[in-house]
Each structure stands twice: as structure tokens, then as C-alpha cells.
Curated annotation (Swiss-Prot):
Residues the entry annotates as binding Zn(2+) 1: 36, 72, 237-238
Record keyword Cell membrane present: yes
Topological domain ranges for the Extracellular compartment: 20-407
Cytoplasmic compartment residues: 429-452
Disulfide bonds: 254-287, 394-401
Protein location: Cell membrane
Protein name as it appears in the record: Bis(5'-adenosyl)-triphosphatase enpp4
Assigned GO CC terms: plasma membrane
Length: 452
């Protein structure tokens, strides 16, 4: 009897040490939700009561540094693979593969474009679980000949509520429920392009609807008794910069259209030269003061954007707020794709659930860091990736962590304490009376004199 009790006690302790709830032995569940084009500072510029409530009970990352180029498809694939664009192969929303001579558009469902990486929904399934995706870019493609266990083909007319309802149904099925879900929603990106992020009047209405969607998700999870057991991550792919019809760079003003093919444009243009590459480069290099031109091999290393055959020989990058076209005007007032160091390009991240701390705020992480964190939450072994788990450990409830600022504070504090103690010791030594010279030769009362 004592032996059985001892074994049960040991197993209980092991469960506690692993950071699991001993009253809930079910597989950890996780929802990843992306609101396309949700710029980080929207959180401080617009009222969002539901999202604020969500973060108050969970964690917030004020800015997420995304991957270059700061476009929809590259960043959504980075979130679910933990890879830079050059590594996962979805380098733009429009691509040309020099090896196969084929062109990719956003509605292309051929798996060859996606097979350079393995998204988390497939890794989760390969390790004995089930995944469900509602419109997440690439989730309706048979990647490595496999689709999510449950998924919806992309259809922009399907409402946010319908997408959430599918997910909650998949999560609560009695026998074959999913444990990982990914949801994509097109706003506020579509309206950000139309109005620009600085149009407070129009964008406030758009973001009010986005916040209502957050409230709907919270409500449905509570109705399904999932709120306290499911982990939810809300984030985005990129931000948005204010643009203008007065800030347009027309390439045909600098070079004849017969000299090149424009693979992708606005505000980062991929150029496939038809004539001599060096000649095209020289013509474009001095085209406009608000546009930088790079040979492929000269693309800055910090962008991790040169080691893939789908990246073209020339890359044109506009300054923030400027747009690149061949010859036409552009009606939209907001855009993204710019340098990923720009704050206007950064999204945010918020998370809630048993895996996360309560009321905790962090300044920044990289979006490739989200993947290893999700793998840890799900209890699966991830694929090789560019993310760093230690960057997100402070967000997690069962992980010990110390931020750089805290570490610096501890070091400075220790130095101050040691310095103070050293000064005190030196001062005390100075105050102590020193022995008189030759005191050892002084006669005591009972000493005999040397001379009688």
C-alpha cells in the first residue's frame, strides 16, 4: 500500500515539475489569430476595450519585428515556420522562380511554392495531433502532400464569426478535436490601404470592428468552456505607412520598359533585367533620391533576403511613404513592405491562456521567435528555424527568465554594493590608530634596567 502511494506521489511531483496542471491531462490547445495589417501603435491611438481586457489578463508585446519584405505572405509563413523569407521560400506576394520559369500569385495553390518549409500545423499532425486552419495563407495548399486536418478554402466573403465558429467546433469535437488552430482576418489591412493609417476618422471605425471581433472570439471561447484552457495568440503580419499620390516613383521615367521585367512592385520592387544587369542597375541607381537600388549580392545581411532563387537580380526599396510603379498612378493611401526596422511596419502581439503570464508587458520580440514558443506550448518538437526561444520565455508562466534590462540592473546594483563596501572598509582602516614606532623597545615596569 505504501509503495503505491509513494509511486502516485512521485508521478504527481513529476507532473508539477513539468509545469502541467495535474487536474487537466488533456493535450495543450493553441489558437493563433492574425489581423492583417494591424500596426503596433493602433493599440495606443484607438480605443480597443476588448483587446485591452484580453491583454490585462494575459501578456502584451508592444512591437514585433517582422521579416523583410514586410508583406502579407512572407510574414504569415514566417510566423508558422520560424524562418526568414529567404529560407522558407515565400519571398513576396508575387514571385518568379528562375529555376522553373514560373510565376506565383497570391491565389496560386501549387505546393511547389510552399514545400521549402514545413508549417506548424503539419509538424503538429506528424506528432500525433490534429490541426485546423481558417483562411491562413497557405493552409489550403497540400504542402508536402498534406493539408491541415480541418481547413477552409480561402474565401474573403466568409465572415469573422463564421471562421471562429468553425474553429470552436473543431476544438470541441468529442473524439477528433484539434489542438492547434490558425485564423486569418483581412482587416485592418484592407482599410489601411484605402484610407491610410493617419485617417483617424475612418480607421477608428475599422478598428472598432476589429475590437468587436476580439470580443466575439472571447465570448465564443467562454461559451464553449474553452476560455480557461485554450491558449490564444493575437498578432499580425505587418503595420502600415501613410502614402500619397505625390510620393510615387515611376520607373519608366528612368528606364525603358523593354529593358526589364517588373516581378513585384510597390514599395519593394523585384527587377528581372532583360538586357545587361549592370546597365539596368546603373540606370536605376540614380533614378530617384527616395529609392535605393541593390544588386542581389549587395542586399543588406540584416534583411536575410538574398539566398533564394526567387529573389531577383535587382531589388528596389522605396523610402517610407513612397511607392514604386512602372508608369501608373496609385489610388491607395497606405502601404507596407518597407524596411523592417521601421516602427510603422511593426505589428504587436498579445496572448492569453494557462501557458502565459498575467498582466505582463514586453517591449519587443522577432516574429520568427513565435514559432519555437508555440512548439513549446503544444509540446511538440519544431523544425529547424531562425527563432530564439529565450526571447519569449518571459511571456510564459512556467519559464524562469530575466530580461536584459533587469540583468543590467542587477549587475549595476552589485557593482554599487561592492563599491560601497570597499569604500567603507578603506575608511575604517584609515580611522584605526596605528602602532607607535619602536614601541616594542619600551620598558615595562618590571623590566630590569640595562645599566645598574
Amino acid at each position: 500500500m505504501f509503495g503505491r502511494v509513494f509511486i502516485v506521489a512521485v508521478l504527481y511531483c513529476i507532473t508539477i515539475c513539468k509545469g502541467e496542471d495535474p487536474t487537466n491531462s488533456s493535450t495543450p490547445k493553441l489558437i493563433l489569430l492574425s489581423f492583417d495589417g494591424f500596426r503596433a501603435d493602433y493599440l495606443t491611438r484607438f480605443p480597443m476595450p476588448n483587446l485591452q481586457e484580453f491583454m490585462k489578463e494575459g501578456v502584451e508585446v508592444e512591437e514585433v519585428k517582422n521579416v523583410f519584405i514586410t508583406k502579407t505572405f512572407p510574414n504569415h509563413y514566417s510566423l508558422v515556420t520560424g524562418l526568414y523569407a529567404e529560407s522558407h521560400g515565400i519571398v513576396a506576394n508575387r514571385m518568379y522562380d528562375a529555376d522553373t520559369k514560373q510565376v506565383f500569385h497570391m491565389n496560386d495553390s501549387h505546393s511547389k511554392w510552399w514545400d521549402e518549409a514545413t508549417p506548424i500545423w503539419l509538424t503538429n499532425q506528424k506528432q500525433g495531433h490534429r490541426s485546423g486552419c481558417a483562411m491562413w495563407p497557405g493552409s489550403d495548399v497540400s504542402i508536402h502532400n498534406t493539408t491541415p486536418s480541418d481547413f477552409l478554402y480561402y474565401n474573403h466573403t466568409v465572415s469573422f464569426a463564421q471562421r471562429v465558429n468553425h474553429i470552436t467546433t473543431w476544438l470541441t469535437r468529442p473524439n477528433d478535436s484539434i489542438n492547434f488552430a490558425a485564423i486569418y482576418w483581412e482587416e485592418p489591412d484592407a482599410s489601411g490601404h484605402r484610407y491610410g493609417p493617419d485617417d483617424y476618422g475612418n480607421m477608428s471605425g475599422v478598428l472598432k470592428e476589429v475590437d468587436k471581433n476580439v470580443g466575439y472570439l472571447m465570448s465564443e471561447l467562454k461559451k464553449a468552456n474553452l476560455w480557461d484552457t485554450v491558449n490564444v495568440i493575437i498578432t499580425s503580419d505587418h503595420g502600415m505607412a501613410q502614402c500619397s499620390n505625390d510620393r510615387i516613383i515611376k520607373l519608366n521615367d528612368c528606364i525603358g520598359p523593354g529593358n526589364y521585367t517588373l516581378v513585384d512592385d510597390n514599395p519593394v520592387a523585384s527587377i528581372l533585367p532583360i538586357s545587361d544587369t549592370k546597365n539596368v542597375y546603373d540606370l536605376l541607381r540614380n533614378c530617384h533620391p527616395h529609392m535605393k537600388v541593390y544588386m542581389k549580392e549587395e542586399i543588406p545581411d540584416r534583411w536575410h533576403y538574398k539566398h533564394n532563387s526567387r529573389i531577383q537580380p535587382l531589388l528596389l526599396v522605396a523610402d517610407e511613404g513612397w511607392m514604386i510603379t512602372q508608369n501608373e498612378s496609385i489610388s491607395m493611401l497606405g502601404d507596407h513592405g518597407y524596411d523592417n526596422d521601421l516602427h510603422s511596419m511593426h505589428p504587436f502581439l498579445a496572448a492569453h491562456g494557462p501557458a502565459f503570464r498575467k498582466s505582463y508587458k514586453m517591449r519587443t520580440i522577432n516574429n520568427v521567435d513565435v514559432y519555437p514558443m508555440m512548439c513549446l506550448i503544444l509540446g511538440i518538437t519544431g523544425q529547424p528555424n531562425n527563432g530564439t526561444l529565450s526571447n519569449t520565455k518571459c511571456l510564459l508562466a512556467n519559464q524562469w527568465c530575466i530580461q536584459v534590462s533587469e540583468a543590467i540592473g542587477i549587475v549595476i546594483g552589485a557593482i554599487m554594493v561592492l563599491t560601497t563596501l570597499t569604500c567603507i572598509i578603506i575608511m575604517l582602516k584609515k580611522k584605526m590608530p596605528s602602532a607607535r614606532p619602536f614601541s616594542r623597545l619600551q620598558f615595562q615596569d618590571d623590566d630590569d634596567p640595562l645599566i645598574g
